From Swiss-Prot:
<dbReference type="InterPro" id="IPR002300">
    <property type="entry name" value="aa-tRNA-synth_Ia"/>
</dbReference>
<keyword id="KW-0436">Ligase</keyword>
<dbReference type="GO" id="GO:0005524">
    <property type="term" value="F:ATP binding"/>
</dbReference>
<keyword id="KW-0067">ATP-binding</keyword>
<dbReference type="InterPro" id="IPR001412">
    <property type="entry name" value="aa-tRNA-synth_I_CS"/>
</dbReference>
<dbReference type="GO" id="GO:0002161">
    <property type="term" value="F:aminoacyl-tRNA deacylase activity"/>
</dbReference>
<keyword id="KW-0030">Aminoacyl-tRNA synthetase</keyword>
<feature type="short sequence motif" description="'HIGH' region">
    <location>
        <begin position="43"/>
        <end position="53"/>
    </location>
</feature>
<keyword id="KW-0648">Protein biosynthesis</keyword>
<dbReference type="InterPro" id="IPR014729">
    <property type="entry name" value="Rossmann-like_a/b/a_fold"/>
</dbReference>
<dbReference type="InterPro" id="IPR002302">
    <property type="entry name" value="Leu-tRNA-ligase"/>
</dbReference>
<dbReference type="GO" id="GO:0005829">
    <property type="term" value="C:cytosol"/>
</dbReference>
<dbReference type="InterPro" id="IPR009080">
    <property type="entry name" value="tRNAsynth_Ia_anticodon-bd"/>
</dbReference>
<dbReference type="GO" id="GO:0004823">
    <property type="term" value="F:leucine-tRNA ligase activity"/>
</dbReference>
<feature type="short sequence motif" description="'KMSKS' region">
    <location>
        <begin position="632"/>
        <end position="636"/>
    </location>
</feature>
<keyword id="KW-0547">Nucleotide-binding</keyword>
<dbReference type="GO" id="GO:0006429">
    <property type="term" value="P:leucyl-tRNA aminoacylation"/>
</dbReference>
Length: 876
């Protein structure tokens, strides 16, 4: 066969068309084979895919193609997480309707994904903004409402007065809205909530069953759920300092053992006592307003300067009524955790210590390490928050912290304040119910109606879907649904009187909390086909970024439980296996400095090696630019590489192979032109080896050698097959690539020999067997090239439909051993030899090694010590 360079621009569209025509990747739910459901987190249709998408979807595609070849009935679908603020921003900034913007972007990104050659079942595609999707989400909402898993209540929210919308805690940065920069206000709004807290303990306990999830993700969820065992303690307010009608403060603590180290109580700015104090004191009122504007995310609380104001209120210590403590309003206490009040033990908590030092409050060490000295132990600038032995704690001295916890809990549970116990054991969770109300247009409408006579009335399921109106305007901030002249006005389903639709839409995290279930039967006229859902769920392998470790993954776990409670699925967990891949990162380039710094795109510079250093220059005028740090690809720093450009220049297989080959999949991959060119050279080399030998190989049937000259070829191929199979099972893509490179090197000479017409039929059959193994090993990563090579060998049918090869057990047995060779105790060489070689054979082979000959330099060894299958030592 005449050898030509492999042309991906010709081959890739041709094979994609063939796969599409043959519907190779469409999945039949009725197929009786064992199922395997692989899913990558579906993308937001921003308009273009980026290299992070390429890596994510290439990984999923390797798994899908490999499992399909192994005989599984594979489900590998794709859709679009299509609701959200960017579409509304585009509507405001460009005057384009969110639906038009979204569907146009979907069209562009779908074409890009198809160009990657992904083995996706596009027949199951949907976007979450499709009415056909969100009508079923409304159905689920109503089912959850009937089951008591949805409720409505007044809730304090972060309100952006410019964007006129609610912000999540994480979207408040230094008291300002993340997008508008406006000072955030605290408002009381009536919001819809999902009762995720009904499942707090179950969500926590079940983490132990998710043994195919990264430990880091499980730990993050465990901490987010935040189970703690503690004590609620009622503190009596000193009557002379008590506001009217108030007599006590309830505190929740996980460390009642440290009560004798208490020096203050701290309450949230929204605590009733704080509100009372603020009403009487303008300074306290201003401080409370400042606290409310600050971010309430965990990160914001941990990094903010600790501030407080003394309310003038005093409380009596629960273990010593003669001991009075001040009550402060503090900016690090939240009303929605515990009781909105804490006691501060400065010696045992760094935050409390910083606060106490700032405001001159006592610091008494009450816990020391077990090996500490009570006479000398003290707390300086660092609190001791560990377990240990009690000191300076009266009747608790000498007890362990665990013993002290129980003694205090028992004593306060037996004591009374008024008509109730002063203390009560309690399990608390950090997890809060999920507020899903958003004051936006581009989201799933909440299917309820508000009637003055009947109250909140669910939309009858027969009247679903509640569709978004198309005729909306974005010429002013706020929710267009509130301003629509007709959409919100309806008749009450109960009494028929005039009523109003709910104008809030659902948080977009709702859309992505059950999409994996819908993929199992997206044609159904109800949310799920339980039979299909129960067959396919849980997802066997879910792949996506670790930035979704908490919210999306936790919400999906809740949703699956809620859908089980309402009869839609039998599964408890949505994802059996989870893999969190690293990012694609790139060097940054810039010109200028400070405020005048201008970022430069990689495509606009060239890199030269001058005086042993890498230097960057603009292509246009040779101006030198600065080479910065390696960072996540981002539009803001222009360190992005367009996948379209890479595919146009090198082909999709090169892009896929590079992002899989250059680093472990859980780590970041550094994009480099040299790395891409190396991947491209590999594809060309593989094609050249196969195509040059194709005529000779197509004339023989593949058969591994059992002895003779070709045995080593078959051993190399079958050992690599076994190893790469294990690598694919464990998602070790970069290790698979390294082994494939080694096999290509091992086959280069035999393939060249066959291409030259040398070797007998047995030899050629062994080479063909090895070549086919090589092609199949690389096919999940470079599927177009593999199809081209497969066809070149004369194979009929698509490789995408072919079964995975089976390795020959007799060929993968390790019959050799590598022995370190020492001369006078210093390692000089290694000897690879048959495991059952006798001592004389080992000795002769060692003396024949070039490294040994050079080291001996003609000397005769005094002694050669052979430790069988371990080591050889030559004494000179």
């Amino acid at each position: 066969m005449a050898t030509e360079r492999y042309n991906p621009r010709d081959a890739e569209p041709r094979w994609q068309q063939k796969w599409n025509e043959d519907k190779v990747f469409e999945t039949d739910n009725a197929d009786p084979r064992e199922k395997y459901y692989v899913l990558e987190m579906f993308p937001y249709p921003s308009g273009r895919i980026h290299m992070g998408h390429v890596r994510n979807y290439a990984m999923g595609d390797v798994v899908a193609r490999y499992k399909r070849a192994r005989g599984y009935n594979v489900l590998h679908p794709m859709g679009w997480d299509a609701f959200g603020m960017p579409a509304e921003n585009a509507a405001m900034e460009r005057g384009v309707h969110p639906a038009s913007w979204t569907y146009q972007n979907i069209g562009s990104m779908k074409a890009q994904l198809k160009a990657m050659g992904l083995s996706l079942d596009w027949s199951r595609e949907f976007a979450t903004c499709d009415v056909e999707y969100y009508q079923h989400q409304q159905h689920l909402f109503l089912d959850f409402l009937e089951k008591g898993l949805v409720y409505r209540k007044q809730s304090k929210v972060n309100w952006d007065p410019v964007d006129n919308t609610v912000l999540a805690n994480e979207q408040v940065i230094d008291g300002r809205g993340w997008r508008s920069g406006a000072l955030v206000e605290q408002r009381e709004l009536t919001q819809w909530f999902f009762k995720i807290t009904d499942f707090s303990q179950d969500l926590l306990d079940a983490l132990d069953t998710l043994d195919q999830w990264p430990e880091k993700v499980r730990l993050m969820q465990k901490n987010w759920i935040g189970r703690s065992e503690g004590l609620t303690i009622r503190w009596e307010i000193v009557p002379e300092t008590a506001p009217a009608g108030e007599s006590e403060v309830t505190v929740y603590t996980t460390r009642p053992d440290t009560l004798f180290g208490a020096s203050f109580l701290a309450i949230a700015a929204d605590h009733p006592l704080a509100k009372d104090a603020a009403a009487k004191n303008p300074e306290i009122e201003a401080f409370c307003d400042e606290c409310r504007r600050a971010g309430t995310s965990l990160a914001a609380l941990e990094t903010a300067e600790k501030k407080g104001m003394d309310t003038g209120i005093r409380v009596r210590h629960p273990l010593d009524p003669s001991w009075e403590l001040p009550v402060y309003i503090a900016n690090f206490v939240l009303m929605d955790y515990g009781t909105g009040a804490i006691f501060g033990c400065p010696s045992g908590d760094q935050r409390d210590l910083d606060f106490a030092r700032k405001y001159g409050l006592p610091v008494v060490a009450v816990v020391m390490p077990r090996d500490g000295d009570a006479a000398s132990f003290s707390v300086g600038d660092t609190a001791y928050d560990g377990d240990g032995v009690m000191i300076n704690s009266r009747f608790l001295d000498g007890k362990t912290t665990e013993e002290a916890f129980n003694i205090v809990a028992d004593r306060l549970s037996a004591a009374s304040l008024g008509n109730a116990p002063q203390g009560e054991r309690k399990v608390n969770f950090r997890l809060r119910d999920w507020g899903i109300s958003r004051q936006r247009y581009w989201g799933c409408p909440i299917p309820v109606i508000h009637c003055d006579d009947c109250g909140v009335v669910p939309v009858p399921k027969a009247d679903l879907p509640v569709k978004l109106p198309d005729d909306v305007t974005f010429d002013q901030p706020g929710n267009p649904l509130d301003r629509h002249p007709t959409w919100r006005h309806v008749s009450c389903p109960n009494c028929g009187k005039d009523a109003r639709r709910e104008t809030d839409t659902m948080d977009t995290f709702v859309d992505s909390s059950w999409y994996f279930t819908r993929f199992t039967a997206p044609w159904e006229d109800k949310p799920t086909d339980p039979e299909a859902a129960n067959r396919w769920l849980p997802v066997d392998q879910y792949i996506g970024g670790i930035e979704h470790a908490i919210l999306h993954l936790l919400y999906s776990r809740f949703f699956t439980r809620a859908m089980r409670e309402t009869g839609h699925v039998a599964a408890t967990e949505p994802f059996k296996g989870l893999f969190t891949q690293g990012m694609v990162v790139h060097e940054t380039y810039s010109r200028g400095a400070g405020a005048s710094r201008e970022w430069v795109a990689p495509a606009d510079i060239r890199i030269d090696e001058l005086d042993g250093k890498r230097r960057a220059f603009l292509l246009t005028n040779n101006e030198e630019v600065s080479i910065g740090s390696i960072e996540k690809m981002s539009k803001s720093k222009k360190n992005v590489v367009d996948p379209d450009d890479i595919i146009a220049s090198y082909g999709a297989d090169t892009a896929r192979f590079f992002v899989l080959s250059d680093s472990p999949p859980e780590r970041d991959v550094i994009w480099s032109e040299a790395g891409v060119e190396g991947a491209h050279r590999f594809t060309q080399r593989l094609w050249r080896l196969i195509s040059e030998a194709a005529d000779a190989l197509s004339a023989v049937a593949p058969a591994p050698a059992t002895d003779g000259e070709a045995l080593s070829i078959s051993q190399a191929a079958h050992k690599t097959l076994k190893a790469v199979q294990n690598d694919y099972d464990k998602l070790w893509f970069n290790k698979a690539v390294a082994r494939i490179y080694e096999l290509v090197n091992a086959l280069a000479a035999p393939m060249t020999k066959v291409a030259a017409g040398e070797g007998d039929a047995t030899y050629r059959a062994a080479v063909r067997d090895a070549a086919e193994i090589l092609i199949q090993l690389v096919s999940p990563m470079t599927p177009h090239l593999a199809e081209e090579c497969w066809a070149a060998l004369g194979n009929e049918g698509l490789l995408a439909r072919a079964s995975w090869p089976q390795y020959d057990e007799t060929l993968v047995i390790e019959n050799s051993v590598v022995l370190p060779v020492q001369i006078n105790g210093k390692k000089r060489a290694e000897l690879t030899i048959s495991r059952d070689a006798d001592q004389n054979t080992v000795t002769d082979a060692v003396l024949d090694l070039d490294a040994v000959k050079n080291a001996l330099n003609g000397q005769a060894p005094k002694k050669i010590i052979v430790v069988p299958q371990r080591i050889v030592n030559i004494v000179v």
